[in-house]
Amino acid sequence: MVRYSASPALETKCAKARGAYLRTHFKNSREVAFTINGMSLKKAFIFLDNVKEHKQAVPFRRFNGGVGRTAQGKEFGVTQARWPVKSVKFFYDLLKNAEANAEAKGLDMDKLIIKHVQVNAAPKQRRRTYRAHGRVTAYLSSPSHIEIIVAEEEEAVPKANDTVSRVSLKQGAKARNLAARKAITAA
């Protein structure tokens, strides 16, 4: 059994999926994860499909140096956004896996929400490129470890109406005096 970095409140009401050493850029994956965290599963699938078709963009908030601006970032309140299709494909596959795990557990598909997404940087894979004058330069890739936990949305418990109102000493004295005056004038 693999250890996840977060533990859900109810293990029976959640499903998990994870991928290790995935050949997709860590920085792009982090931005996709931050965007889909908290979405419902259906909404996340629609969003990821739209990113693949360049209808919606993933906002780049942390790793945004040199990232171009696009009007599609306005819905998230940013100007810098991109369409990291390869990272989106990995997230789509992991969400499909989590959905299948939830279905196997008998969870309600319409109530599933992405409760936890985490992306960690995997060890860099090394290659080399040959340069002029006999030099060699490192050619590194930045793979990712991704873990996702989806859970059924908890139903909101209605707040009790039986609230005891706290009255200060001064407010209580005023109320008693007012009641006494009403009693005197009524008599």
UniProtKB/Swiss-Prot annotation:
UniProt-recorded Gene Ontology molecular function terms: structural constituent of ribosome
Protein name: Large ribosomal subunit protein uL22A
GO-annotated cellular components: cytosol; cytosolic large ribosomal subunit; preribosome
PROSITE patterns: RIBOSOMAL_L22 (PS00464)
UniProt keyword list: Cytoplasm, Ribonucleoprotein, Ribosomal protein
Species: Schizosaccharomyces pombe (strain 972 / ATCC 24843)
Entry annotated with the keyword Ribonucleoprotein: yes
Gene Ontology terms: biological process: cytoplasmic translation
Assembly: Component of the large ribosomal subunit (LSU). Mature yeast ribosomes consist of a small (40S) and a large (60S) subunit. The 40S small subunit contains 1 molecule of ribosomal RNA (18S rRNA) and at least 33 different proteins. The large 60S subunit contains 3 rRNA molecules (25S, 5.8S and 5S rRNA) and at least 46 different proteins. uL22 is associated with the polypeptide exit tunnel.
Domain of life: Eukaryota
Further remark: There are 2 genes for uL22 in S.pombe.
Predominant cellular place of this UniProt entry's protein: cytoplasm
InterPro entries: Ribosomal_uL22 (IPR001063), Ribosomal_uL22_CS (IPR018260), Ribosomal_uL22_euk/arc (IPR005721), Ribosomal_uL22_sf (IPR036394)
Location of the protein in the cell: Cytoplasm
A Pfam family this chain is assigned to: Ribosomal_L22
Lineage: Eukaryota, Fungi, Dikarya, Ascomycota, Taphrinomycotina
Family the entry assigns: Belongs to the universal ribosomal protein uL22 family.
General function of this protein: Component of the ribosome, a large ribonucleoprotein complex responsible for the synthesis of proteins in the cell. The small ribosomal subunit (SSU) binds messenger RNAs (mRNAs) and translates the encoded message by selecting cognate aminoacyl-transfer RNA (tRNA) molecules. The large subunit (LSU) contains the ribosomal catalytic site termed the peptidyl transferase center (PTC), which catalyzes the formation of peptide bonds, thereby polymerizing the amino acids delivered by tRNAs into a polypeptide chain.
